[in-house]
Amino acid sequence: QRQMCIRDRMDQTACAVGGVITIDFKDPAHPVVGQTAIDLAKHGFVMCISDTKGSHADLTDDYAAIRREMESVAEQFGKKVLREVDEDEFYKALPKLRKAVGDRAVVRAMHFYNDCRRAAQLCAAVREDDFETFLRLIIEGGHSSFEFNQNAYSIKNPKEQGVPVALALSQRVLNGRGAWRLQGGGFAGTIQAFVPVDLLDAYKAAIDGCFGEGSCHVLNIRNYGAVPVTPDM
């Protein structure tokens, strides 16, 4: 329940603040939020959110396992969460950790350390208007989620892999030009892609052709969040 609450806060905060945001949940009761403006149009890009039509039914255990396994690693060091565990100490303890918590927990912890670092680099790239680095980090983070966090599909239903299919299509159309990755908690649902305007028609055709008309939603990132609307405006 607490995990779902934090995830919901992330969605609501992103909408309320606008732009590219960072949220530090070190103190879940008082998260620290940062904001950076981004201008996709300036670089000739749009953002696409594509619905892979997957079902989120029976995925509760998959979502919960990610947190449970990362916390199991932290417990080996007498800590509650991984951010309290020194990364170098984690790597020194790999032989012990593999036996104690299993390999999936270990590689998910590796993803945690790398992705926390990547998030800071991504935010810096946006602030510095380094769009090439921004795209590269989006792709790197997506690969890490797929390969190491292992949340692109549920192992309980390996025949249903809509997210990987959408990612593979995205790579086919955008390789060398844009960026793509799974979105949110993963396992099913949506992916995001940053698409050059000149490739938008081809990208939409590929996604809609696979998942159905209207599956690819073309968006922009609004740099203004929630604003008051009054009758005199």
What name fits each language-model region?
Residues 14, 19-181, 193-233:
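C-terminal nucleotide
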Residues 188-191:
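N-terminal pre-core extensions flanking Radical SAM catalytic domains
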Residues 2-6:
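Short, small-residue-biased leader/transition segments that mark boundaries at the very start
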